[in-house]
Amino acid sequence: DKTNTAALELAQLGQAIDHMAENLEKQEDVRRQLTSDVAHELRTPVANVSSQLEAMIEEVWEPTKERLQSCYDELGRISGIISDLEKLRQIEASNMVLEKEPVDLLELAQAVKTAFEPELAKKKLTCMVTGESAIISGDQRRLHQVIFNLVSNAVKYSTESGQILIDIHNSGKNVQLTVKDQGIGIAKEDIPLIFERFYRTDRSRNRKTGGAGIGLTIVKAIVLAHGGNISVESVKGCGSCFMVVLPKK
């Protein structure tokens, strides 16, 4: 009867309100955690620059080239953190709206390699792009970001004179992208966590490279938005291999 129907509707409404409240609470927890993480990431470089500049202004230290370079490096680190956060904000705010078009991943990989040539030369690294033309329907700008971030990680954590391999090949209805390096590798216990926001396997190593541990979070979000998946194989001290599989359509 109408009474039972009304009671059922009220119960369903109550459940919906409880569910909404639970989601809002989770979002608030995420927001608080994000604010805390950002503050933590920025606090150290800001404090370093501030203390060094203060010491030079008060003539406690001479403004040597090395100290000025240190300040410059810390400012670069801050800039890298802000840049990564802005990219992640754009991705999350837009719910990843993709502007799809035919994209050749081999061409993108070659373009990324060219962009990294100065850094490769500086570290005496060899970078090879192998494979075949592989065209998918995807967002070119976002897919460029995927390859760029993976190669950036490989460059950052490779030792001098190492080799980086970018391989693209067709695999049935999919395309597989592999970025392999001979760098410092990732410990087994850290592998399941590396795609989490702000997670870094070794915080000290990022002092020179900048960034906030968001690059792989961005990569995973873009790959998933394209209906693909990403995995990694790594041995501490022996390098890493990131594998991305994307559907062609």
Question: Language model features by range: what are they?
Answer:
Residues E119-V129:
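Short conserved segments within the C-terminal catalytic ATPase subdomain
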Residues A154-V155:
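Short helix-loop "hinge" at the ATP-lid/N-box region of the Bergerat-fold HATPase_c
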Residues I186-R200:
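Short conserved segment of the HATPase_c
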Residues D1-T35, L53-E58, Q90, L106, ...:
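Membrane-proximal HAMP signal-relay module
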Residues A93-L98, G131, I135-G138:
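Conserved micro-motifs of the catalytic ATP-binding
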Residues S161-K173:
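Short beta-strand/loop element within the Bergerat-fold HATPase_c
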Residues A7, A11, E99-T114, C127:
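A conserved beta-strand-to-alpha-helix junction within the catalytic ATP-binding
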Residues D73-I81:
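Short alpha-helical segment of the dimerization/phosphotransfer core of two-component systems
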